[in-house]
């Protein structure tokens, strides 16, 4: 064994230390070792941290995935439930809005037909109140107050020759007699009609009586309809009823009139409105008449006048058109003081500064002819279930939506409400609005008006308000010429031009002459059919159309005031024609 390099032995037996490692070298070695150990520990720690982080991430990802999967499952379950609920709701909506109304209408028609069948026979053995039931022929029931055309397509029209039928409107019987102001309403079960019989020529502020009739549509042997009169009432009680409007109601007719023996201009100059009358006539010969004072009348109106055109029975309410003069310092007068509506014909606009035109439009509501009263349109609304106590209110539209108040008519077609307003002020074209009411159990009801832009023809007018004038100015002119819409109006762009309506116009810009049957679109007349000789004097016209659902024939009755050279100044004539649509 090699001797130790650390120690050596000498001869004198003493020990001496051998070579020794340097202390500095040992310190460096320890430092390197520590650095190495720390590095290994650091790397190990980092690896542990990274590994733990990755494990945590994987665990979290798995949990999130599970959560997302759970949420997705719940969403799919909810979507399935919603789809099922939507399907049920669609079935309910279709049932309520389509199937049920059709079923009810079918049952109603069947019931009416059954009643018409059983209510026949001799009066002694009949179980009905009268020999003939107040029910239109079944062929017409489902074609009344319906839009004839609903496809918005382009159509052509032809108006047939007047059909020869007995007139349901009696004429005057003396040279100085006068029958004027016809009002006609056709309901699903029956029709109602009225006109004024003036005793001294056509001065309606003197003395007059009121003729009222009700009847049904029947089919003649020739195949076309006839207006069969079943009941007549002649109100000759000394009251000078004026401007009466009629409406068909369950089992009878309702009529709204006002009573006055002074000039219309004097009514506007006063401060207290004339007497308002509501008359109910039923098929069992019951006649009930009440003086009414609708909410909003006293203190607001100098005068209130029925609209002449027919009213409607709608949602258990009786609605009539009206208009009149508003007192300037009344709450209604103050509220509407700055309101005005100025329509514009884009094909024939009025030139001038807009501010000036607006001021002129505002002034047009205050004609000096009517003592500078604001002339305002309104609606008389009466709750039918309280009709015997005449619980009525006046619902006043905003003048920001309507022109100056005038005569008018309320139409109910396919459950849509429309309002015709006579063009009495400066606007020369037909005025037709879609309207919607908001009725309240307490407080003031309201109405919204949406103007239908018609520019196809003008009414005759005098002075600055002839049929050629399109600029705002104050005047009282024009003539009552109500239209009958054949199609619903749509606000959808591009199809409004296919809105069609028919009526009888007076083909002159200044004179009430040349009665002419027509069919019109918004911007152009489709067909014209003059009635009588050129220059024939005429006045008010009112039109109603219906369909024979048995053979799909369309009929229109144009009721016109025509000049008479034999008996009286006017003869009211119902002209029945067949309307062909292709």
UniProtKB/Swiss-Prot annotation:
GO terms for molecular function: exo-alpha-sialidase activity; host cell surface receptor binding. Residues 240-245 are annotated as: Involved in neuraminidase activity. It catalyses: Hydrolysis of alpha-(2->3)-, alpha-(2->6)-, alpha-(2->8)- glycosidic linkages of terminal sialic acid residues in oligosaccharides, glycoproteins, glycolipids, colominic acid and synthetic substrates. Residues 56-582 are virion surface. Keywords: Disulfide bond, Glycoprotein, Hemagglutinin, Host cell membrane, Host membrane, Host-virus interaction, Hydrolase, Membrane, Signal-anchor, Transmembrane, Transmembrane helix, Viral attachment to host cell, Viral envelope protein, Virion, Virus entry into host cell. It holds the Pfam family HN. It is found in: Virion membrane; Host cell membrane. Coiled coil: none annotated. The chain crosses the membrane at residues 35-55. It comes from the Viruses. Its EC number is 3.2.1.18. It is a single-pass type II membrane protein. InterPro entries: Hemagglutn-neuramid, Hemagglutn/HN, Sialidase_sf. Disulfide bonds join 178-202, 192-253, 244-257, 350-471, 382-392, 465-475, 545-556. Residues 1-34 are intravirion. GO terms for cellular component: host cell plasma membrane; membrane; viral envelope; virion membrane. The record marks 180, 242, 264, 323, 369, 407, 422, 512, 540 as: Binding to the glycan motifs of the host receptor. One of its GO terms (biological process) is virion attachment to host cell. Its main location: virion. Glycans are attached at residues 127, 284, 329, 400, 448, 464, 507. It is an enzyme of class 3 (hydrolase). Attaches the virus to alpha-2,3-linked sialic acid-containing cell receptors and thereby initiating infection. Binding of HN protein to the receptor induces a conformational change that allows the F protein to trigger virion/cell membranes fusion. Binds to the glycan motifs sialyl Lewis (SLe) and GM2 ganglioside (GM2-glycan). Neuraminidase (sialidase) activity ensures the efficient spread of the virus by dissociating the mature virions from the neuraminic acid containing glycoproteins. The C-terminus (head domain) is involved in binding the cellular receptor. Homotetramer; composed of disulfide-linked homodimers. Interacts with F protein trimer. Belongs to the paramyxoviruses hemagglutinin-neuraminidase family. This is Hemagglutinin-neuraminidase. It comes from Mumps virus genotype B (strain Miyahara vaccine) (MuV). The lineage of its organism: Viruses, Riboviria, Orthornavirae, Negarnaviricota, Haploviricotina.
């Amino acid at each position: 064994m090699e001797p130790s390099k650390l120690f050596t032995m000498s001869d004198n037996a003493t020990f001496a230390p051998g070579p020794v490692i340097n202390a500095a070298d040992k310190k460096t070695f320890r430092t390197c070792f520590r650095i190495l150990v720390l590095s290994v520990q650091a790397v190990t720690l980092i690896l542990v941290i990274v590994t733990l982080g990755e494990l945590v991430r994987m665990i979290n990802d798995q949990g999130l995935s599970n959560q997302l999967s759970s949420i997705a499952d719940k969403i799919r379950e909810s979507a399935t439930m919603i789809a099922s609920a939507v399907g049920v709701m669609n079935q309910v909506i279709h049932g309520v809005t389509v199937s049920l109304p059709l079923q009810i209408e079918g049952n109603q028609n069947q019931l009416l037909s059954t009643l018409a069948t059983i209510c026949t026979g001799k009066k002694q053995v009949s179980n009905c109140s009268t020999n003939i039931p107040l029910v239109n022929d079944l062929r017409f029931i489902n074609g009344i107050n319906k839009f004839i055309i609903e496809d918005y397509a382009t159509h052509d029209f032809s108006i047939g020759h007047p059909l020869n039928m007995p007139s349901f409107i009696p004429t005057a019987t003396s040279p100085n007699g006068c029958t004027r102001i016809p009002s006609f309403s056709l309901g699903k079960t029956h029709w109602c009609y009225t006109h004024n019989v003036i005793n001294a020529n056509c001065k309606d502020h003197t003395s007059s009586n009121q003729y009222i009739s009700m009847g049904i549509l029947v089919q003649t042997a020739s195949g076309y309809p006839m207006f069969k009169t079943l009941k007549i009432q002649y109100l000759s009680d000394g009251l000078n009823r004026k401007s009466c409007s009629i409406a068909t109601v369950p089992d009878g007719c309702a009529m709204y009139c006002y009573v006055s023996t002074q000039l219309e201009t004097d009514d506007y100059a006063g401060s207290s409105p004339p007497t308002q009358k509501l008359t109910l006539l039923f098929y069992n010969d019951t006649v009930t008449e009440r003086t009414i004072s609708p909410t909003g009348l006293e203190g607001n109106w100098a005068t209130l006048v029925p609209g002449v055109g027919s009213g409607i029975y709608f949602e258990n309410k009786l609605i009539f058109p009206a208009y009149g003069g508003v007192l300037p310092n009344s709450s209604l007068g103050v509220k509407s003081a700055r309101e005005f509506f100025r329509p514009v014909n884009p094909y024939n606009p009025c030139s001038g500064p807009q501010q000036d035109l607006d001021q002129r439009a505002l002034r047009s509501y205050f004609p000096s002819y009517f003592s500078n009263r604001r002339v305002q349109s309104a609606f008389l609304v009466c709750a039918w279930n309280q009709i015997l106590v005449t619980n009525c209110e006046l619902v006043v539209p905003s003048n920001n939506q309507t022109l100056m108040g005038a005569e008018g008519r309320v139409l109910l077609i396919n459950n849509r409400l429309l309002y015709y307003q006579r063009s009495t002020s400066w606007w020369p074209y037909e005025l037709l609005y879609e309207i919607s009411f908001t009725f309240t159990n307490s407080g003031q009801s309201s109405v919204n008006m949406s103007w239908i832009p018609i520019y196809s023809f003008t009414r005759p007018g005098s002075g600055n308000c002839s049929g050629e004038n399109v600029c705002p100015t104050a005047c009282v002119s024009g003539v009552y010429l109500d239209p009958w819409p054949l199609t619903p109006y749509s606000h959808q762009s591009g199809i409004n031009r296919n809105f069609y309506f028919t009526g009888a116009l007076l083909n002159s810009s200044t004179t009430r002459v040349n009665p002419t049957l027509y069919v019109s679109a918004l911007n152009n007349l489709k067909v014209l059919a003059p009635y009588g000789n050129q220059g024939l004097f005429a006045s008010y016209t009112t039109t109603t159309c219906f369909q024979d659902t048995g053979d799909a024939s369309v009929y229109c009755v144009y009721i016109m005031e025509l000049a008479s050279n034999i008996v009286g100044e006017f003869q009211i004539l119902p002209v029945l024609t067949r309307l062909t649509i292709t």
